[in-house]
Amino acid sequence: MSNNNISTLSSVTISELLDAGIHYGHKASRWNPKMAPYIYGKRDDVHIINLDYTVSQIDVISKVIYKEIKEKNGRILFVDTRRHRDIVAQYAENCGQYYVTHRWLGGMLTNWVTVSKAINKLDQLEKKLADPEKIVGYTKREILSMQRMRDNLHRSFGGIRNMGGKPTLLIVMDINKDHIAVKEARREKIPIIAIVDTNSDPDLVDYPIPGNDDAIRSIRLYCKIFSDAVLLAIEHMLAASGVDLGAINGDNPSERLKAAKKITKMKLSKKVTKINVEQDQNKLEKDNKDL
């Protein structure tokens, strides 16, 4: 794709969606009538989703994600507390975003002060346990207790510890399972992108994607699409700063992203230094004229 061209941001095809099983809904008896516009028909008492709508929505949502990062410098939070958690966490990390995949704790969005305190506690425990001198005098039992607390906090808050504030966009894989996350985001007026299966209410989210929300292949494809949109936005942002993300060595997008950010910081630092030197030189010339 050419820089800053998002007209063809998502190139996913109906064939790819079919291969991932995204067209399979739930049993007809479990359907939500609000999903009727997105249902193609039934097969063996299972609803089949009309993938024309899915492709169209994926294109729209890819652009929403792209703009959220590039134009708003936003923070995107991926949510999936089911068995797919490792896939979701991996893709979120690879594109430099955030995730909750262990358990959604009530107040994660509506009580950010308490969440921040928990994250600070996690940071303190990690620093303490990493320094042998700081745990001198503690019994083995006390150290084990601190380790368990650290592990519990990491499971709950590790994916959002560096978020630096509430997310500006939520991506939810199953709005029925993670309904509390949806409820809190709506209360906080945080836009929601979500997969809506045939048993879901599409009216609960801002950007619904009709599709299977259970199959591992489906979740992997969704995450790849979302992650690609984020990475493209970051690539264009870095390109505007003179950094070519594609030219940085490494197979892992996350590592390349970190390297690119480091280069950007160095460039900005040099730019600030150059400005300061020029200012000092101008001041010196002015002082010489005054003499």
From Swiss-Prot:
A GO term for molecular function: structural constituent of ribosome
Give one GO biological process term: translation
A Gene Ontology term for the protein's cellular component: small ribosomal subunit
Record keywords, A-Z: Ribonucleoprotein, Ribosomal protein
* Family to which this protein belongs: Belongs to the universal ribosomal protein uS2 family.
Short name of one Pfam family? Ribosomal_S2
Which HAMAP family does this UniProt record tie to the protein? Ribosomal_uS2_B
What is the designated name of this protein?
Small ribosomal subunit protein uS2
Q: Which cysteines are joined by disulfide bonds?
A: none
